């Protein structure tokens, strides 16, 4: 541990035996052992406390970094628009079923003397409310495929 070999320890023990004598040597060895144990325990306690402090500092640092990251994300949300401005919807002309390459037949001209029948608005609303919703044909290729 300290770079002391067995021969050096034997030399220290022999000097202690000569200085203290055989009567007081066992008590002195016990006291020295207690002191060494206390030193080891105190060093270990200091080491654990330092490691806990380092760990606590690391945890504090991580929490601080996470707090800063969350603040940055909130700032980005505030500064960037949540939704883009909606694009205006363009009115699409009348839906046609026939192919556009086919020639369109000429519509017969209506004589100005004939009057078209007038339908009351209430009857149109009534028909629109009672009409059944249309469903596409099972082999309709204009609709996206549905999941089974």
From Swiss-Prot:
Signal peptide: none annotated. One of its GO terms (cellular component) is TAT protein transport complex. It is found in: Cell inner membrane. Part of the twin-arginine translocation (Tat) system that transports large folded proteins containing a characteristic twin-arginine motif in their signal peptide across membranes. Together with TatC, TatB is part of a receptor directly interacting with Tat signal peptides. TatB may form an oligomeric binding site that transiently accommodates folded Tat precursor proteins before their translocation. Gene3D superfamilies: 1.20.5.3310. Belongs to the TatB family. Residues 85-148 are annotated as: Disordered. One of its GO terms (molecular function) is protein transmembrane transporter activity. Residues 107-148 have a biased composition (Low complexity). It holds the Pfam family TatA_B_E. The Tat system comprises two distinct complexes: a TatABC complex, containing multiple copies of TatA, TatB and TatC subunits, and a separate TatA complex, containing only TatA subunits. Substrates initially bind to the TatABC complex, which probably triggers association of the separate TatA complex to form the active translocon. This is Sec-independent protein translocase protein TatB. The chain crosses the membrane at residues 1-21. It is a single-pass membrane protein. GO terms for biological process: protein transport by the Tat complex. Keywords: Cell inner membrane, Cell membrane, Membrane, Protein transport, Translocation, Transmembrane, Transmembrane helix, Transport.
């Amino acid at each position: 541990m300290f770079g002391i070999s067995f021969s050096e320890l034997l030399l220290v023990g022999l000097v202690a035996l000569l200085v203290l004598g055989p009567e007081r040597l066992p008590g002195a060895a016990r006291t020295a052992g207690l002191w060494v144990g206390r030193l080891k325990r105190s060093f270990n306690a200091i080491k654990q406390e330092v490691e806990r402090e380092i760990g606590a500092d690391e945890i504090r640092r991580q929490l601080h970094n996470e707090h800063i990251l969350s603040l940055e994300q909130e700032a980005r949300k505030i500064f960037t628009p949540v939704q883009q401005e909606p694009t205006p919807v363009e009115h699409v002309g009348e839906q046609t079923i026939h192919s556009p390459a086919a020639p369109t037949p000429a519509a017969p001209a209506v004589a100005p003397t004939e009057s078209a029948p007038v339908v009351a608005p209430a009857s149109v609303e009534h028909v629109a409310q009672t009409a059944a919703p249309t469903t596409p044909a099972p082999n309709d290729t204009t609709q996206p495929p549905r999941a089974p």
